[in-house]
Amino acid sequence: FVNILPEIDVPGHSLAAVASYPELSCTPGEYYVSPGDRFMVWPGGGQHFYGLIDNTLCPANEKVYEFLDKVFTEVAQLFPFQYIHMGGDETARNFWEKDDQIKALMKKENLKNLDEVQSYFVKRVEKIINSKGKKMIGWDEILQGGLAPNAAVMSWRGMSGGIEAAKSGHEVVMSPTDFVYIDYMQGDASIEPPVYSTLRLKKTYSFEPLPAGVNEKLIKGGQANLWTEQVYNMRHAQYMTWPRALAVAEVLWSPKEKRNWSGFVPRVEKQFERMDAAQVKYAPSMYDPIITVSKKDSTKIIVTLDTEVEGLTIHYSFDNSFPDNFYPAYKTPLTVPAESAALKLVTYKGNKQMGRQMVITMAELKKRAGIK
């Protein structure tokens, strides 16, 4: 059976709520909800968020807690699972800074900064959730300003938040972007649906959810995330899910000493056969070359190739023809001829084509090499 963990993401990610009930924000007024518009910027590598539109609930407003009590009452009745996820991530607090209600709350509760303001909010939300007979879990931002007494932590910004929480005696679910964000590209950008980062199958399979030095009983498990802002239909969602979800599953149900990449690959290939029969879409990216581009003497482009799967041969061309297994096989880093039309690549196992035909234009090679 499957337990469904519902998430009501607060105080950020709450534009739908404040658009419907503007009085719940620190900037009451008329809201315009326009999906796809840019609403936030991420200066400083994504650790702090600056909102262009206020999509946050106001922690100083008692009506917010009355509203959330009603929401979590319904959620608790609908979902039997013992946990409710309250989000807590990516909260743009720049609108709080200017608000007189927030300033008054900070003075009244002796809160030194906005981290402590958010912690005050999280602790009150935990009391609401606990009053429904449920445990609260939230993203690792809920550690900032002081963790709520009984909260569990879902660690997405690496493993460190989860480790910190576990060392403090709190339950943890590991969900780090570097290993289990399956909305990321699975291979080279020239052939994958465009996203801002890459996560290959082999990297996902190397995920170790049990870090050294913590009580393993507090690590409740792991979670892979497929965010769908840039996933446009079900076939696309299937493509992003498989086969990386297979890697996540095997990592979570197998002890570290039992895991072996070379043994995992044939099991994936067997699942590909089943998916083909069921017409389930999956990514064959593990067969495509890994491309690293550098420069030499300021003008020469050097291409280094590798594969995730053992036993593949990479064939290439520079003359705009489509290579097959009769074309040159990659052995050492390639110096791109100045007169090249494009770099085209394909992988074979024996006489069988395994990877997709890949095309890297000269303009793209120069861009990756840092040559203008």
Which residue ranges define each predicted feature?
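Structured core elements
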Residues: N3-E7, T56-C58, Y83-G87, I137-G138, ...
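Domain-scale activation on soluble regions of proteins
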Residues: N3, L15, C58, E192, ...
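An acidic- and aromatic-residue-enriched active-site/binding cleft used to recognize and process polar
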Residues: V2, E7-H13, D89-T91, E141-Q144, ...
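Short, compositionally stereotyped local motifs that mark structural "simplifiers"
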Residues: P255, R259-K372
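Substrate-binding cleft of carbohydrate-active enzyme catalytic domains
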Residues: F1-K134
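Generic recognition of stable, solvent-exposed alpha-helical segments in well-folded globular domains
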Residues: L52, P59, K63-V71, E116-R124, ...
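Short, solvent-exposed loop/turn and secondary-structure capping segments
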Residues: D9, L15-S20, W96-K98, E164-A165, ...
